[in-house]
Amino acid sequence: MPEKSTRQKPTLYFATVLHCIGDPWISGAAALQVIDDGYLKVVNGLVDSIGAESDLTHDDLSSCNQVDYRGNYIVPGFVDGHLHYPQIGVIGSYGEQLIEWLQKYAFPAEAKFSDPAHATSAADFFIQQLLRNGTTSALVYATVHKQSVDALFSKASAVKMRLATGKVMMDRNCPENLRDTAESGYEDSQALIDKWHGKGRLSYAVTPRFAPTSTEEQLEFTSKLFNDNDGVYLQSHVAENKAEVEWVADLFPWSRSYLDIYDHYGLLGERAVYGHCIYLDDTDLTRMSDSGTIAAFCPTSNLFLGSGLFDLVGARDRNIKTVLATDVGGGTSFSMLRTADEAYKVTQLAGNTVTPLQLFYELTLGGATALSINRQVGNFVTGKEADFVVLDPNATEILSYRVDNAQSIEEVLFAFLILGDDRCTLATHLMGEAAYNRTDAH
């Protein structure tokens, strides 16, 4: 008996289709493709084509399932380059700056993840919040506990989400119940890499929290993990807060700078992502650019914790790769739209400007390019994975009023970026399948 075909019937999604086909930092408005009264055709979870609805034939229509999102906007799924799933219970916690905030709120919250049931429950809530906000790809911090990684990878795998995470490595300057050793951190991380990395849409991220919480021996083991395992990420923090920078200088008196510590241990490169990058000097910034290391811009966190202002335009001018990030729970929203709003304001405060298209690019193709997943996601090129978000221009009264008065697609985009939040997400699709639907969520 012949095997039953697993090929799914194609699906046509009707809406205005928006995506970047280039980098607006380089090519300006030419980087954006807009198809009014358009369609997105998905076959077996991949993008087959996009185009004008009027170009479809009767046979095209009759051979496909059809989903009517007319009046809304289909855009590529958002990419979040830095956030902490164990900190969802302390998001919006009052009154401290970075180091004090970690000690008072973050570390106690992370200690709860020694309980696998708690980790599983938190992972489920976390993934649902990402999808509710239109985020389809994310680089995430877990805790020191292996089960925190297992829980998040399991949930992401179940919904077919493109996600990278890793066990936090800390062997000093942290509570005893969150401390590993250089050896155990290495062994646990390698076991998790062997178990999860490259399985489906999952990738592993080697995760030393930041230099102050790792001994030099642990940083040596971190380098071995990062450089001996093909395709893994390295994620950490650098130069977020002035007091932190001073502390690091005391802990590593031999180093030229905070970034120099990571460089010394071979922890820079095209798959290394560092949160914040606010207090870096010219030598550091040149090294970031030359090595291809990625800076994760976390505006809501930087403002909430009073850390400082990242220079996005300056980073781009230096050809430093950047990815926008929520940094939940120091960050105050899962929404990449809210994050873009704050990124715009931070850039304004620095005396620069960032265009609506540049911000949209950072959320989609730009973030994917920074994380080296632009061959898989980021826009609607044929053959890419069909991760997309349906944005509702009538989600709120003020957004609807502003969009109705827009004179260009750039104004529509900017309205979403400045006025939008999770209410704008009508639906989120992973590999073509609806993973979140606003109607079902109520």
What role is predicted for each listed range?
Residues 1-61, 72:
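N-terminal metal-binding scaffold of metallo-dependent hydrolase/deaminase domains
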Residues 40, 45, 71, 82, ...:
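Divalent metal-coordination and catalytic microenvironments
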Residues 89-119, 167, 172-182, 240-271, ...:
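Active-site gating loops and adjacent loop-to-helix segments of metal-dependent hydrolytic enzymes
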